[in-house]
Amino acid sequence: MTEILVVANRTLGGEKLIALARSRAQAVQDVSFRLVVPQSKPTAGLVIYDEAVRESAQIRVDLALTRAAQEGMRASGEVGDPDPFLATMDAIALRRPDEIIISTHPATQSGWLRRDLIERIHNASGLPVEHVVTDLDREGLPFGVTLVIASKTSSGEELIERLRVKAAEDERPRLFIAVVPLQDGSGDAPREARARLAAMLDKLQGAGLLASGMTGDPDPYTAAVNALELFRVDEVVISTLPNQRSGWLRSNLIGRVQHATSAKVEHVVVDVDDASAGIASTAA
């Protein structure tokens, strides 16, 4: 079996990379793809949680593997070292691929190219390396991406139904990336946020939506800005409790996120009685 190692991060959903993988799958009778997504920290926020950074890379892996399966491709994937050179060399040592595809932004935007990643990988591995340049600013993505920020209301029926309608109305495939901010810096906060996230994803995927997610910074604004730094999205949905009970609304979260992005920002109100129950929480 021929194995092709694919290394990409923010350009992972680019049509050129997808087209190249598709052509390889058609040209080679018995081929599999191994995806490596190096971790990438956002610049916003005073504290960046390592687990959240890793989760964001895992989202890319999960969604890419789902897309590959839809294309009929045999693929597996992993989150890699933050250094793309080390991430690639680790995968080469473990998997012993036959060739490598590396996807980057154009030279003027790519930190990987400024560090001569393509040449270094070729020289160190001795393997064929194909470089795919994806200019997302010009080309866009072949699917829509909705960022969803929610905490206590994350499993609310109003929110799930609104997202289901969005997917049904869009002519393109639509991906949903959920971010559930931690409640605080306590030891139980990550567990509680992961439980909320799991319940939300179970409902979204049960409704037939292509969704993945991560926990985020305790400050919902920082969680949103970090996600906007990590992912290219065309819309943001923020779900809160009703006005008088929402700390997020009292802090003007909707307006602040609107100022931080050119993407459309939509607010979905969910009453606590309709939301996920059983996990202690501050008002979202």
Model features per residue range: what roles?
Residues 126-140, 262-280:
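Short, flexible loop segments at boundaries between secondary-structure elements
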Residues 104-119, 240-255:
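Glycine-rich, Arg-bearing micro-motifs that act as flexible, cationic patches
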Residues 1-48, 131-134, 142-191, 267-270:
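Small/aliphatic-rich secondary-structure junction motif
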Residues 63-73, 169, 199-209:
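Short helix-loop-beta junction
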Residues 54-62, 115-118, 190-198, 251-254:
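Short, surface-exposed alpha-helical segments at coil->helix boundaries
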Residues 71-99, 209-235:
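Structural beta-alpha unit
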Residues 3, 99-101, 145, 235-237:
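Structural motif
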